[in-house]
Amino acid sequence: MIKVSVMYPNNAGARFDHDYYRDKHMPMLKQKMGDACKSYTIDKGLAGGAPGAPAPYIGMCHIFCDSVESFQAAFGPHAKAIMADVANYTDLKPVMQISEVVVG
């Protein structure tokens, strides 16, 4: 199992519409990816590790798939449409990482 993490840096003055992300963008991504997206989670940044520190990321999602190949096969054909929707909820450039889920 792999996890695709898409993280949005918590830059001062940035725009991020959490409601749109939760209610429209992620369900659209799931619909386009079909069964290749086993599940996903959405996180809203609250704080950093030190008291009073801001969260490094304002929001993020984690998309769970069987393999890198299954993610790429499902996401690739829809990448343009999915990425075009980003402007509807943020002006931030997402940071993406694909990880192997070791325990979970």
For the regions a language model picked out, list residue spans one by one.
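Macromolecular interaction modules
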Residues: M1-G104
